[in-house]
């Protein structure tokens, strides 16, 4: 049954031009990290090693939100087609149906994020560190999907909501990287704050990531 759901979901994504295009984003991000950033550094003469954590944060945080948008649009389509209403008369509950789909995108986001970190070869992260960062950041995928469905009633509204949601959820962690005092915790409300802090701590060689304001500054 679960294999059928996975196949059905992937077919739905591939049928839609927008969703199928979004599926290619992780590959694009991986190629940008591996070849685009070094090329830009060579052309501009900028030492990108100084900004490795910033680049990795952008690539890492974007991926789960893309998968969250995928499942968000897919559920919006189901709502338009009254699929969720039809499921209520089947042995499968709506909660079980949605839970499975959110687990699916979380796993895909985790694997894709790990692949981007591994393929880009930036920051000197170990495989276990890549796995930890990928797992931590992947939980943003279902959150994005839920927020899109809470703020939009159709795919057009969903597209507008997606741009605003992803922009806000990504810009806060990025801004936090420019603060070296307790002010950075202002941006801790964003889900991507801690994945960004983990990446920054590893890339900058700060060692153990402290988890409270007191440990950091007192």
Question: Which positions does each model-derived feature cover?
Answer:
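A structural motif at transmembrane helix-loop-helix junctions in multipass membrane proteins
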Residues: 17-20, 135-172
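Hydrophobic alpha-helical transmembrane segments of multi-pass membrane transport/permease proteins
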Residues: 13-39, 55-70, 110, 162-176, ...
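Membrane-interface helix termini and inter-helical loops of multi-pass transporters
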Residues: 38-50, 120-125, 185-187, 201-205
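N-terminal Sec/SRP start-transfer signal
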Residues: 1-19
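Hydrophobic alpha-helical transmembrane segments of multi-pass membrane transport proteins
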Residues: 51-89, 94-116
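Alpha-helical transmembrane segments of multi-pass membrane transporters/translocases
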Residues: 24-26, 197-218
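Alpha-helical transmembrane segments and their short interhelical loops
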Residues: 94, 104-153, 213
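Hydrophobic alpha-helical transmembrane segments
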Residues: 20-23, 55-59, 99, 103, ...
């Amino acid at each position: 049954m679960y294999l059928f759901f996975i196949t059905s979901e992937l077919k739905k994504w591939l049928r839609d031009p927008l969703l199928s295009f979004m599926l290619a984003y992780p590959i694009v991000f991986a190629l940008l990290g591996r070849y685009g950033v070094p090329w830009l550094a060579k052309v501009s003469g900028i030492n990108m090693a100084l900004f490795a954590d910033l680049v990795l944060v952008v690539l890492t945080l974007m991926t789960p939100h893309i998968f969250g948008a995928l499942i968000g649009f897919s559920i919006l389509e189901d709502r338009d087609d009254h699929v969720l209403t039809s499921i209520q008369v089947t042995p499968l509950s709506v909660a079980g149906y949605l839970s499975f789909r959110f687990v699916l995108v979380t796993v895909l986001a985790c694997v894709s994020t790990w692949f981007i970190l591994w393929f880009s070869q930036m920051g000197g992260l170990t495989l276990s560190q890549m796995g930890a960062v990928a797992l931590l950041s992947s939980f943003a995928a279902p959150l994005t999907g839920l927020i899109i469905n809470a703020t939009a009633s159709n795919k057009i509204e969903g597209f507008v909501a997606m741009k605003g949601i992803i922009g806000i959820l990504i810009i806060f962690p990025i801004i936090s990287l420019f603060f070296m005092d307790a002010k950075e915790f202002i941006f801790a409300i964003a889900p991507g704050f801690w994945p960004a802090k983990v990446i920054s701590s590893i890339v900058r060689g700060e060692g153990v990531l402290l988890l409270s304001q007191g440990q950091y500054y007192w």
